[in-house]
Amino acid sequence: MELLFTATLLHFIRLFEKAHEENVKKADLEKKKAANETEMKHVVHNSWLNNLNIRASTLIDQRRAFNTMIMLQKVEMPLPDMMAAVLGMDESVLDVDQIENLIRFCPTKEEMKLLKNYTGDKATLGKCEQYFLELMKVPGVESKLRVFSFKIHFGTQIKELNKGLNTVNSACEEIRTSQKLKEIMKIILCLGNILNQGTARGSAVGFKLDSLLNLSEKCSANTNMTLMHYLCKVLASKASDLLDFHKDLENLESASKIHLKSLAEEMVAITKGLQKLNQELTASESDGPISEVFRKLLKDFISVAETQVATVSSLYSSVGGNTDALVHYFGEDPNDYPFEQVTATLLSFVRLFTTAAHQENVKQAELEKKKAAKEAEMEKTKKRVSLTNKKASGVGEEESCLI
């Protein structure tokens, strides 16, 4: 038995040593591979720099030229084809990331001046210089690239802005028209006046919106029940149809995540972007044939974009009026109590109310369960007593018969 155990132990030790050796070999191979890749990059970089010097392509800063080369490798197409895609604003050829990279690597004024003043054979220049020269063939190429980028982003920007504006408008409408919320507010005011009876606050005609959050406080020092739980208990017994008032406020949570300042910034960005498109359209009229396709496509796009921007601008204007009306609805001043604070307070109230209502529901269910169990026990006791009485009555009859 001991020999078998020793043999098994030795077997597992050998397996462990073998696995460890394989892991060490694998780790060494990965280190060598990483080192080789790093060395290869240095070799390629140095080789490229040497080649750069041989070909006299030292007009552009070496680091910038190298980074430009890396960027162009990701585009993977001849420079004339790339520029045709830019002027044709062809999203099937160039994606937004590639466009942003092209913008980053547009030649500066100094670099363009350097290339224009170069009197040598331009064919001997490096790929970075060739790329810059290709871009320089198109007047205002950086502006055109930015137009292309705006066009790609425009659809998503308009969609998201529309969504945000509609959410805010819907939330304002839902809150102001919810009869259930209005009834709950009345009941809260009534309960507050009852609890504060005999004090200066016992005849209030309204309350601040922030007071809704005070309902999570205890009714008194002698009880663990909060005002919110008491409210839910009253509603459950007197107006249970109001307990699901939060269903009226479908867009409240989404609206609470939206900041009007962000919507304003998006609106400004889109409006300014459209202005730049019109400026570029005017500027490109003097470009000549090279920008003919670009001008036609841009003109068509502006026509569609202007209609969409006009629609969203109208929607944006309505949001300002609706949010102010909502704040006034609760007797607050938009300058002191902004829309974001209204939705945040209401959402907190809804969550506190929902939690309290659930807890009261569970508590009530437990009480009813205990009540039912108690009634069942009483019924059993009643039956036992009845049966005992019957038996006792039967014994008495037999005894009387014997007598």
From Swiss-Prot:
SUPFAM superfamilies: Formin homology 2 domain (FH2 domain)
SMART domains given in the database record: FH2 (SM00498)
Region (Disordered), start-end ranges: 373-403
One family name in Pfam for this protein: FH2
PROSITE patterns recorded: FH2
Domain of life according to the entry: Eukaryota
Protein name: Formin-like protein 21b
